[in-house]
């Protein structure tokens, strides 16, 4: 190895117990090694009729003198030469065409071998980037089919030739066959521009895989794939929502598949006669024994710390003033009942929908609150479609039933007296959730017209 280069000292030692005359010699070891170069590999994307210059630099080599270089495109020799005092060699292409796209290799050679720089020069367009925060993407809701508003931006649209079209591929989840069509593009795509295409005649409630490939005069660019799913719109233009859990589908609330057990719909009139005493409500929030509510049953076999999570439907919202300092405010309120000596914890989360799902702690309360219904009010400021999650955590014993009722969402902030009294009287912790969207690209995306 080249690290072994250097001066070595050799000395005599005793021979069969006899002293010998001390002698020593110095030996210099010189290890020759081929040139180390950079870049080892570099991709260059450039449009036709444009120029490009590639540069291969020597980092170290031994011997450093009498270095030669060769530039090749594939197997075709382009240029050879010898280094003088410079530490790099360049190869320019004045005007790119189909004939001079490809892999360029620069070999720098000495007596010990060669180092190589490789350059992939291509006219391929970069992959598009799907936009996952489309407001109300299920824009048509017919009986058996639905339509989906697909949106995306183009990464570095000016890096190569103008994108003239996109090849759209779509297939139903679980199927093998792709259906393809071309989406024509008129004019130049600007960086950050939001492009929209409506997918129609999609079968409810099937999910679909979508593939998008940009096309230029060079040919196909890089593809990107996403999955779209049908979700029944609830209050697509959210103004007010109220759920007392009286209807059969419990207002489209659903159980979380990742928890330990489920919430249960119940009324006092229909509950099991073997219910655990000294815990749980005696009536719904209105005082009716026939009225329903949702609760967690903490009797055996439930264990301390186990969780039950109840998910609200997805609410779609549209920012009213994307240039303003705030998002639209909503007042989220609900009634909760936490009575029993073994009460655990009731948490509420705000889940924002997007490319990555984010859950923000919104409200929390724990411990025995007495045999009564309590009310909570919290301001929320969602920036995109959202869900609310009720999480009940089992306490140390069976007398730990937790119930909720009359969940409401109304546009506008909660009254100050509600926030001041309802959230503090029982020791609950209310958290105002302010989530701001900083990147200017999102503001541009929201305002960009559909193509």
Curated annotation (Swiss-Prot):
- Supply one GO CC term from the record: plasma membrane
- Which Pfam families does the protein's record reference? MAM
Domain of life, per UniProt, equals Eukaryota
Q: List the disulfide bonds.
A: 56-106
- Protein's UniProt name: MAM domain-containing glycosylphosphatidylinositol anchor protein 2
Where are the annotated glycans? 105, 198
Keywords, sorted A to Z: Cell membrane, Disulfide bond, Glycoprotein, GPI-anchor, Immunoglobulin domain, Lipoprotein, Membrane
Q: What does this protein do?
A: May be involved in cell-cell interactions.
Residue ranges annotated as propeptide are 427-451
**Domain Fibronectin type-III positions:** 133-234
Q: Which residues form the MAM domain?
A: 241-416
Q: Where is the Ig-like domain?
A: 35-122
| Organism in which the protein naturally occurs | Macaca fascicularis
Under the subunit heading, UniProt states: Interacts (through the Ig-like domains) with NLGN2.
* Membrane topology summary: Lipid-anchor; GPI-anchor
Question: Where is the protein localized?
Answer: Cell membrane
Where does lipidation (GPI-anchor amidated aspartate) occur on this chain? 426
